[in-house]
Amino acid sequence: LSIRRQRQMCIRDRRRREIHKGDCGRILIAAGSKGMAGAAVLSARAAFRAGSGLVQVAIPVELFPIVQTGIPEATCLERDFSKIDLSRYDAAAIGPGFGKGEESVKFVKAIIENFMGPLVIDADGLNIVAEQCLFEVLRARKKGSTVITPHMGEAKRLLGENLSNRKEIIERLIKKTGAVTVLKGHETLVATEESQTYINTTGNPGMATAGSGDVLTGVITSLLGQRKPDGSRISAKEAALCGVYIHGRAGNLAAEAIGEYGLTAGDLAYYTAIAIKKILE
């Protein structure tokens, strides 16, 4: 099925006049490491552009100045699991630019085991799952509460096989992880254990740029943390479908404005808000 048909699944109503930032979602993004602080900035920026009310970024203390300068709307937390109250968050993401050191491994495992809300796992978060064989821990999470967003390289590492058929890959990833799966690439695929596979029709070659996946992680996590006008939460499947569509639509709007060759992940984050505005028109 084409994701285009699902584009207004979770962005279909204007916000209530009496809404407050708590209604718009409090999310945690665990991202960034030495030399990769930009991943945290891009994910957090995209989350705000997608509508989050509050975004907190868990990063190494030495990165605080970079991240707080790059995204002043976000607040920074020391990446120490014992100091983070997970009950405060409506949704969380882990992995962009995260690193794979010993402390990173412990943090990823702790988040997967202890965070009860919807969780997006990307990049190094997925690499750690693959290298540490955390599949049982992942499958033990509440059904429908996890979204994974691998590109083909990460997908092959998760499966431990060099496959090329994307339909087969996404089906095997779902079986192995139990997660809503977003297989990134040209015509990104989204699927769950219960659903058909959806194909995204938005996007362009200009989005093949560093940080594009970090932006997608921020968008999906943001949607997971928000409420619909009736007060209900957006499901992981809805957030993945809508997030992928918005991400591609933002890329198309950016390409229309500046062309594909010079498009950056920062442009994708900026145009995320405009993409949502277009959906609401």
Give residue ranges: language-model regions.
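Small-residue (G/A/S/T)-rich helix-start motifs and N-terminal tracts that mark the onset
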Residues: 5-8, 12-119, 127-147, 152, ...
